[in-house]
Amino acid sequence: MKIGCVKEIKNNEFRVGLTPDNVKAYIAAGHHVYIEKGAGIGSGFSDNEYVDAGASLIDNAADVWNLVDMMVKVKEPLESEYPLFREGLILYTYLHLAADKQQMDALLAGKVNAVAYETLQEKDRSLPLLAPMSQIAGRLSIQEGAKYLEKKFGGEGILLAGVPGTPKANVVILGGGTVGMNACKIAVGMGANVTILDISLKRLEELDNMFGAHIQTLVSNDSNVERVLKDADLVIGSVLIPGGSTPKLFKKKYLPEMKNGAVFVDVAIDQGGCGEASHVTTHDDPVYTVDGVVHYCVGNMPGAVPRTSTIALTNATVRYGLEIAAAGLEEACRKSEVISSGVNTYLGKLTNKNVASAHGYDYTDLASLI
């Protein structure tokens, strides 16, 4: 199979879909790999490293798109890339279609066979291709939130951990999954007061066992959320429905009751965000303020640390990519429910229930198409 990788064009996105080590793995399996020149520079991988690994360098992205059977990316294609879609092309990347109707329509119209990292699910219901970026985003959320609590950015002007004789910051984490747990780890490590909310008592028990007296755990409901937000200095939105639209737990009505200069980091923004006042921002212009609360809603947070995040992501993605390349997508889906769970569009049909529900579109069972 011909495998391709192009330079990411999203704002300040420096990750890359394939590393030189990934290229070696595909070449060893008998495939051909085509890399756009400069694709890996932002993550610290030179063109020469890709050539040494066995890849062919291509001068421009369009030629790579037109040449390959499977395109391996990091982030969703942008509108300028839609004309490069074609029937039968396998697109292997993050898609987040529940929050992006325009992209979904373009994939359906182009009859692209799109495999979304974020919906590929193992039998134990874990999300192996979402987990590494969730770990990084969770940790970054506290790092970024602490920065935007500084006065010059519109924050309260407080230090997360305080110093002797001053109060610590109150950190509230909405959602106790991978993002929330990693945010909790960093916030506790920095010495903040941490409260984490989740709808699952089992998950709260797990978090309590992990962090003990260092955190407070609460069942997530409107009353508890509203109560803890009044004293919050930093709020992390880390709610997830795999492939689906995120519930709006951080309501506009809470904002006037919060501290002036409090910070909200909406890590769920890729799936539409868990804040009613949330809209996507960029690394160039990451924050805005609503009713005195600073909102940080960057849609590609791990792109800020591309070396770490590229290696972490591709460590996970290469395994499934090799399975698809070896058998072809159709046969790979027949053999593996895990891979089939990642397929969001196939030959012009929408094959993910949560995405279909988010937009009111018809859902087609992938098994009926392969």
Which residue ranges define each predicted feature?
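Glycine-rich phosphate/diphosphate-binding loop of Rossmann-like nucleotide-binding domains
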Residues: 6-42, 152-240, 287
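Short glycine-/small-residue-rich Rossmann-like dinucleotide-binding loops
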Residues: 69, 75-76, 95-96, 221, ...
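Adenosine-phosphate binding glycine-rich loop
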Residues: 118-159, 269, 274-370
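Glycine/serine-rich phosphate-binding loop and adjoining beta1-alpha1 elements at the start
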Residues: 2, 8, 77-169, 298-300
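An N-terminal-biased, well-structured beta-alpha scaffold segment characteristic
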Residues: 2-110
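Hydrophobic beta-strand scaffold residues
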Residues: 33, 57, 91, 114-115, ...
